[in-house]
């Protein structure tokens, strides 16, 4: 049927476009803010007029790109690839005017206006506007993680996450904050950071209305209302709402006291106890000079019982 054929052709183009979007680390559906342009492999077999491309050394891929040398089996594939070099965007949206380099990208973009979601997950009935989005979603059900890091072996379900992870090893941080210059390995990390400058808190609690800058902070807060305690102590089974609380509790079993006092050497299990203890030292050591009115500390070895009412400068004058 014509409709089914069109869907199949669109899905084939979707697979081609996915190769462009995913390698870049973001799915932007062919729009202008692409950061890294990768080549796609179209499925059609149409010839296009124009100057014959340079020959390729590979007989199976006789059409080579004169700009980057990549070879293709079909001239039509090369013609589409050439747009990654020329920047040509021949497909325009009649609704908003945005232009795209591939027809499949325009088709997907058009669904942002129509709300159409023709691709349904057979597992959970969730619907998607693009076949590539459905394929990525289905990995949540199957557990498939096809992208493996050659450096550490960690695997990823999405190539965008894989591309961002690689920057941990390479040290690349291409996203710089325009406010403070701090650089990040992923655009999402930059977006979260920028909220520290803008004060934006887009995540609101449905129960009490408290707003948060990070979705993770909202998720933790929600446990106050739900009573959820997902973090369990492996020793005694006690459960906690936050991982930090579990870490503090675990020290009751291990005896670890990671906070030492530089004044007296006493060690503490909790940072709050350590801070309170330090303040006690400060209160004992700060005095107001009766001569000049300045604060001063007791000299080494002195105690409150032997302290004078004057600082060392006034006492010696």
UniProtKB/Swiss-Prot annotation:
**The organism sits in which domain of life?**
Eukaryota
**Sequence position, cross-link Glycyl lysine isopeptide (Lys-Gly) (interchain with G-Cter in SUMO2):** 33
Name this polypeptide is given: Zinc finger protein 771
Q: What's in the GO CC field?
A: nucleolus; nucleoplasm; nucleus
Task: List the InterPro entries.
Answer: Znf_C2H2_sf, Znf_C2H2_type
**PANTHER family linked:** ZINC FINGER PROTEIN (PTHR24393), ZINC FINGER PROTEIN 771 (PTHR24393:SF166)
Sum up the protein's function in the record's words: May be involved in transcriptional regulation.
Annotated C2H2-type zinc fingers sit at 63-85, 91-113, 119-141, 147-169, 175-197, 203-225, 231-253, 259-281
Origin species: Homo sapiens
């Amino acid at each position: 049927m014509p409709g089914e054929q069109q869907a199949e052709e669109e899905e084939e183009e979707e697979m081609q476009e996915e190769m462009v979007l995913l390698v870049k680390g973001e799915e932007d559906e062919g729009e202008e803010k692409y950061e890294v342009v990768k080549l796609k492999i179209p499925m059609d077999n149409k010839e296009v007029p124009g100057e014959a491309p340079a020959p390729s050394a590979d007989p199976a891929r006789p059409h080579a790109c004169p700009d980057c040398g990549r070879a293709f089996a079909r001239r039509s594939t090369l013609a589409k690839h050439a747009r990654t070099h020329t920047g040509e965007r021949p497909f325009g949206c009649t609704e908003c005017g945005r232009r795209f380099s591939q027809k499949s990208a325009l088709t997907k973009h058009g669904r942002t206006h129509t709300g159409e979601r023709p691709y349904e997950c057979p597992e959970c009935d969730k619907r998607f506007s693009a076949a590539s989005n459905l394929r990525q979603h289905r990995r949540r059900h199957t557990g498939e993680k096809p992208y493996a890091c050659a450096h550490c072996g960690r695997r990823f379900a999405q190539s965008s996450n894989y591309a961002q992870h690689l920057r941990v090893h390479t040290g690349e941080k291409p996203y710089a904050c325009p406010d403070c210059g701090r650089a990040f390995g992923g655009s999402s990390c930059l977006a979260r950071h920028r909220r520290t400058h803008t004060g934006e808190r887009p995540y609101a609690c449905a129960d009490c209305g408290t707003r948060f800058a990070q979705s993770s902070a909202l998720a933790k807060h929600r446990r106050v209302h739900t009573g959820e305690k997902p973090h369990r102590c492996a020793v005694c089974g006690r459960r906690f709402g936050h991982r930090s609380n579990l870490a503090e509790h675990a020290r009751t079993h291990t005896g670890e006291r990671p906070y030492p006092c530089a004044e007296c050497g006493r060690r503490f299990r909790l940072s709050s106890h350590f801070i309170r203890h330090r303040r006690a030292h400060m209160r004992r050591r700060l005095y107001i000079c009766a001569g000049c009115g300045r604060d001063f500390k007791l000299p080494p070895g002195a105690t409150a019982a032997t302290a004078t009412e004057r600082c060392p400068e006034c006492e010696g004058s």
